[in-house]
Amino acid sequence: QSLLLFFLFISFTASSSIDENEKFLSFLEKEWQWELAQNPVYATAMGVKGFETQWPDNSLKGIKLREAHIQDSFVELKKFDPNSLNKTNQLNLRLYTQLTQTALSISEYNRYLFPFNHRGGVQLAHEAVESLPLNTAEDYRFWIERLKNLDKRIERTISVARLGLEKNYKAPRVLMERVYRQIKIQSKQNIEDNPFYKVFKELPSTIPLEEQKALRKDARKTIKEEIIPSYKLLEDFFK
């Protein structure tokens, strides 16, 4: 998916006065905006405003809507005549069509029913902050607000995982044991040792001390009342 985002980003450098080229570039721009909406953490990392408190919609409905969008995009791609595009956009069309076909092929395997991976997943959500700009008090407030919405993502993950089990989609036990250990780290009651609190231990000196205290207080409250209970639910699900 990151390859798709990168492709869309660099594609906007192409331009043409020919109608077909303009239509194609307009299509790519719409796809780019859609991708940003689907990947709000990435959007924030790219400096795009308006997604600062959001997580990807990992609900079953959200997943199905994405699959439908990719299918619709593939249909739209087929409408473009390569011979009416300049050489740059001919290449862009081939590449984006190939990426879309690959996404469609992958969706046939229902990989979303395996929502856990020891190298990524909701149990490692704290790692998202590594790609985000954290320079001002506002940046930290946005991150706290995003954390307050993490419970919904965890609940949706459990719901999708439960559906996967009902359909007999099971990941290797050895991998899930690693995931379980990662979850237990998040559900520990010691806030100071919680992975989500690490980023608040040393705040930029440009943030006034009183504001630093307020940010840490809000972070501890959020971790205690929102993060730890949500991961405890996830831990119980794994049991």
Q: Which functions belong to the PLM regions below?
A:
Residues 1-6:
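Sec-dependent signal peptide recognition
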Residues 7-16:
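Hydrophobic h-region of N-terminal signal peptides that target proteins for export
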Residues 15-239:
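N-terminal maturation segment of proteins
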